[in-house]
Amino acid sequence: HYGKYSYLSFVGDAPTNDVKGVWASSDSPLVWLNPERGSTRVLAGLPAVTALTELPPKYLAANLARHVEKLTDAGLLGRGITQVLSPRDEGIEGAARYIQGEFRRIGLQAIGGSYLQTWQATLDNGKVQQLSNLVGLIPGSDPALANQPVVLGAHYDHLGLDERGIPFPGADDNASGVAVLIEVAAKLTRAFTPVRPIVIVAFSGEESGLLGSKHFVSSPPSALGDVGFYAMINLDAVGRLEGRKLQVFGSESAYEWPFMAQGIGYTIGVESQLPAQTIASSDHVSFLNNGVPAIHVFSGLHTDYHRISDSATELDYEGLSGVASWLEEAAMYLGQRSEPLRVTLANAPVVVAPLGSEERGASLGTVPDFAYFGAGVRITGVIPDSAADAVGLRQNDIIMSLNGQTVTDLQTYSNLLRTYAIGDVVAIELNRGEEIVTVTATLTARR
């Protein structure tokens, strides 16, 4: 009746309107400009508002960094299992002592009175080497589930020294995983009582063929009794998340894994990606091969993998804090679940590690994209000064064949590379956008 006014005033009993009008509001955030009227007015934006306070992260970057910096100290000689020590160096034994001390500090129970699981392992070169896993326990409350523990694990060994005698730091691989393992175990010990036990393990000998996890699965500590492992989560290279989705390998081994990962993403905001393959060079495979549902949590490959440049300063500690929160949620889900998982191990394919291993001398130097599901192998980058770098391979190239042999997936790519030697010349067919490109590369030693 009156139209739109900013103010109206009335007098008398009738009442009678005596004043009305519209305030000028050229930049009010309440103004709406009808786009059909073609107005040229520019409204001021809303001022930035700072929150009164912010919650600190559940897992502090400084605590995670403290573990990483200790485990990457040069005196540990790259945490190699066969390094000869000088009087001033601790080697991998120093890393083991540090982890034992942390297990004791945070209140993990020592199984059978000791955190050490020590045995004699025969290496590929025939040498017999004493190795030690570090094992701690968070007891469960239900006696009926006492022999069905969840295992949370991360390997603490690395590559030792390079040919110049310089230690490989192994910050992402795998000081990052051990740091998360310790911090999450500390939180669970303080604030969570699971119905089934949770076993915390730092494995040795992963880089030499999963020696620690194979021994743990085949010969678990006797104090655990007649154990049947319920499930296993493996932390390996979780320090370079950098805003990406967390990769979870092996999710096909139990029906519940994808739903658990999805639920955790909704709860804490750390999203997961479930690649349809498993990296065969990490410790969860020892459990898969023994019928235990197991997943590998992974932040993604990078060009510092197995290089001197994999240092503590390169890690994403904010992302590492998110990984720790993810693991805590997963451990609580499994630890308070009394029903068995619906095991689907037949659906969990295993592929060989694609970026090179001690057994394969020749290397192309590509960084594969595990999230790619199409034909061939898409690469996310190349190792500097590698064969791939020399011939101009680049991000998003898709490798379709090697010497005329079709590369259907990461499995075949890995298998084909293992048939070549250093110095072999390989014709590589690429899909580069809309173009098919062929280049010829001379394979080199791993760098």
Name each region found by the language model.
Residues 1, 326, 335-447:
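C-terminal recognition in membrane/secretory proteostasis and scaffolding
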Residues 6-8, 22, 29:
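Short beta-strand elements that form the blades of beta-propeller/WD-repeat-like
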Residues 31-93, 99-101, 106, 147:
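N-terminal hydrophobic or amphipathic helices/low-complexity stretches enriched
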Residues 79-139:
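A non-catalytic alpha/beta surface segment that caps or lines the substrate-entry region
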Residues 136, 152-210, 327:
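Alpha-helical metal-binding/catalytic segments enriched in His/Glu/Asp
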Residues 193, 203-302, 313-320:
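Metal-dependent peptidase/peptidase-like ectodomains
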